[in-house]
Amino acid sequence: MAEIYYDNDADLSIIQGKKVAVIGYGSQGHAHAQNLRDSGVEVVIGLKDGSKSTPKAEEAGFRVLSAAEAAQWADVVVILAPDQVQRTLYADDIRANLEAGNALVFGHGFNIRFGYIEAPEGVDVIMVAPKGPGHTVRREYEAGRGVPVIVAVEKDATGAAWPLVLSYAKGIGGLRAGGIKTTFTEETETDLFGEQAVLCGGVSQLVQYGFETLTEAGYQPQVAYFEVLHELKLIVDLMWEGGIAKQRWSVSDTAEYGDYVSGPRVIGPHVKENMKAVLSDIQDGTFAKRFIADQDAGAPEFLALRVKGEQHPIEATGRELRKLFAWNASNDDDYVDGEVAR
């Protein structure tokens, strides 16, 4: 059974007694910084010169420094930049400004798990990873609630890393909902697997194949879109509320029976074997090496795959349909970069 921590398990005064630098002011960065500040913690923001986030952070009342200056000032350095830029940011601006007794905080274990970042002697390495986007982390905190968090300690150089990680998690509101104890390895490998095999890669491919199957059989693209993509939210919401059992309880008997007899025909044992291969590539570092090598080369594979995905017929159909509904009219205008949700 997982070990779960709550507010009563943490001493907020620990993080209140630290100077915290949040490196990055995107979705997670703004939530961590604002929640910590509202919990009585002294926080500065570290950003590169010319960052588009600087005006936002300053408008929110934060002092903005360079990443190097912020790291030098702080006792606790929170790295919330995208995975692919963390190691360069760390090497160029952060590492030389760390000293014994400091702590590095991560929101995801990628760079530690795969060895792209290595902390110097005497520096704690901890993780607090909210299981929700930053705007939800902030909204729930303001409402007196919290988003569950994953907490881990990779390196306890000071002997006080666990009290610190729990105090930090309490400071952002995570222990109101609960903090699940894990390791950097478990968080990284399961997170990447979930994204690739189910939540992003698996679902995206399933939806595209479903759309193609219907349209190639002569059905209208608009009808196909509703059946395989639009209604997915209704099903996922039910699963989120009460698991697969509630989803099956809520749908018609026809849909439930079709679930049992046709689901295994589509997602058969061969899919599970493919999932195992995906997990193996994550565990042995194959995926990480491929991703970082592509990013270092300017992301040619990544960008080509993005363009290919955007050109799938389901995207044009979706844009056409979403314009018809007032409650959905602006949903195609509220994102720009792939990192917006992180």
Swiss-Prot record:
Cellular component per GO? cytosol
Query: Does the record bear Oxidoreductase in its keywords?
Result: yes
Checking Pfam families in the record gives: KARI_C, KARI_N
Keyword annotations from UniProtKB, A to Z: Amino-acid biosynthesis, Branched-chain amino acid biosynthesis, Magnesium, Metal-binding, NADP, Oxidoreductase
Give the EC number(s) under which this enzyme is classified.
1.1.1.86
Biological or metabolic pathway of the protein: Amino-acid biosynthesis; L-isoleucine biosynthesis; L-isoleucine from 2-oxobutanoate: step 2/4; Amino-acid biosynthesis; L-valine biosynthesis; L-valine from pyruvate: step 2/4
Please give the cofactor(s) recorded in the UniProt entry for this protein.
Answer: Mg(2+)
**Gene Ontology molecular function:** ketol-acid reductoisomerase activity; magnesium ion binding; NADP binding
Q: How is the cofactor bound?
A: Binds 2 magnesium ions per subunit.
Please name the Gene3D superfamilies in this protein's record. Answer: 6.10.240.10, NAD(P)-binding Rossmann-like Domain
The record's annotation in SUPFAM superfamilies points to: 6-phosphogluconate dehydrogenase C-terminal domain-like (SSF48179), NAD(P)-binding Rossmann-fold domains (SSF51735)
Q: Please give the PANTHER family that the UniProt record associates with this protein.
A: KETOL-ACID REDUCTOISOMERASE, MITOCHONDRIAL
User: Family per UniProt?
Assistant: Belongs to the ketol-acid reductoisomerase family.
The record's listing under NCBIfam families reads: ilvC, PRK05479.1, PRK13403.1
Protein name from the UniProt record: Ketol-acid reductoisomerase (NADP(+))
Q: Which organism is it from?
A: Leifsonia xyli subsp. xyli (strain CTCB07)
